[in-house]
Amino acid sequence: MLQKAETAYATFKSDHKYRDRDGRDIIFGTDHVPNYHGVVYIELVKIPAILYSYTGKKEYLQEAQNGIAKMEKYDMLASGIPSSNEHFNGISEMAGHETCNLATLPYTYGYMLQVTGDATWADKIEKAVFNGGIGAVTKDFRAEQYFSAPNQFIATLNSNHLGYQNARMAFLPGHDTECCTGNVNRFMPYYIQQMWLETKNGGVAASLYGSSEINAVVGAGKVPVKIVETTKYPFEEAIAFEVQTQKTVKFPFRLRIPAWCANATVTVNGKKVDGKVIPGEFFELNRVFANGDKITLLIPMDVKVTSWPNNGVGIERGPIVYSYPIASTADTVSGDYKKATKAFPGFELTPAHDWNYSLLVNNSNDVEVVKNSNYTYPWKVGANPVRLKVPAQKLKDWKLNSYVDTASKATIYQTSPFPANRETTGDKEYIELVPYGSTLLRVTVFPKQ
C-alpha cells in the first residue's frame, strides 16, 4: 500500500505539464509561485509530509515545507490566512481570503506539527484561528462570510470587491455555494484536536493552549494521569496545569514556547525551573510528578509593529492581531434571500462612523496596552479583555470606493485601497484597537504616516 502511495504521488507530480494551471501548482518542491485555487493547494501540500511520516524520506518533508514557505512568502496576510479569493492573490491592503481556508490551514499545519515536532506550526495555527477564523463569523456563530479580509469597511449583498458573486462578503448563514458554510465549522475543532499531543517517549505535549482536561497513559509503566489546564489565554499570559495521578510517575511534559515570546518562565509548585526556555521550541519537564503538582507557564505578550506593502502598518500582541473596530449599521437580510431564517439571520453591515485613519506609530513604545479584567465572552464586540491605544490621524482622501451599477442604476460601495494622497485632516487623536476576532467591520492594515 505504501509503495502504491509513493507511485501515485510521483505520478501526481510528473504529469503536471499536461494539466491546467491548477496542475502546475502541485510541484511543491520548485520555485513555481502558487497562483491557483488556494483551498486545493493547502489541502494537497500536506501529502508529501504524510508520506515522510511513513517512509522517513526527507525529500518528501522538504517538498511540503517548501510548498508552504513559498505560499506564505507571496500570500500570507495579517490575519494569519493566505490571500485566496478562490485563487491566490498576493499581499496588499485589499487582499482577502476564502473562508474554506480557515479550516484547511490549521488542518494541514496540524499534520506539519505532528510530523516535525516544530512548535512554530502551532504558533501559525493559533494566529489563523484567533484572528482570521473568528473574524469571519458573527460572534454567535450563526452567519459567516464567504470572503473576509483584514480590511473590510462594508459587508453587504453587493459590496464584494474580491470577485465572483456580489454577496460573498455579507454575513449570511449560507452563500451561493455551500463549501464555506460547511468548512467554517471545522477550524475550531481542528484547534482543539491539536491542543494535546502524545510524544514518542511516553509523554504529553501541550501544543495549543486553552482551558481543558486530558486523560493520558504516560511513562514506562503506562500510568494513567489526568492533566487539568486552566487559563484565559490568548488574552492573559498565565497558563496553569495540575497533574492528577493515583501514584507518582516519571514522564516528559512538553510546553510550547511561542516564537513571539522572549521571556517565558516555567514554575513547578511555585519554584522556577532551571533550563533554557527557548522561543519557538518546546520546553520539556522530564521529572517525577505527584498528585496535585502544579505547573505554571508565564508567557509575556509584547507589542509588535508589523510592516506591509504600500507603506502599511499593523499591530500584534502575542497571538492576537489588533484592528480598529468600525461601528456599523446592521440591516437584516430580507426574507427573499431564502437561506436566511429567523433562527439564522443574515446581515448587511455598513459603516456608521469614520474609519479612515493612518497610524502615527514607529515602534511598540507608541502603543499603550489597556487591560480589562471585567469581561465574560472575550470575543463579544465592544467587551474586549485587551485594547491597544495608538496615535492616529484621519486621511482626507480615504473613502469607500463607489460606482453606479448599469443594470439597477444603484450606487455600489466597496472597501477601498490606501489613497495616493495621504494628506491628513484634523489633529492627532488616539484610537483604540481591539482583537481582530472580535470585529465585524475593521481596519487592520493602516497607511503609515
PLM features: what roles do these ranges have?
Residues 1-7, 52-65, 72, 113-123, ...:
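Structural helix-adjacent loops and short alpha-helical linkers that scaffold large soluble proteins
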Residues 248-268:
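Beta-strand-rich binding/interaction modules
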Residues 64, 123-131, 136-239, 278, ...:
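C-terminal beta-rich recognition modules with glycine/proline-rich loops and embedded aromatic residues
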Residues 261-287, 305-310:
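Solvent-exposed beta-strand/loop surfaces of large extracellular or lumenal domains
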Residues 1, 35-53, 97-113, 181-191:
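Well-ordered alpha-helical segments within folded domains of soluble proteins
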Residues 21-44, 79-104, 141-175:
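Carbohydrate-binding/catalytic loop surfaces
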Residues 3-23, 63-80, 127-138, 212:
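Long, well-ordered core segments of solenoidal/helical folds
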Residues 1-35, 39, 49, 58-59:
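Catalytic cores of extracellular degradative/oxidative enzymes
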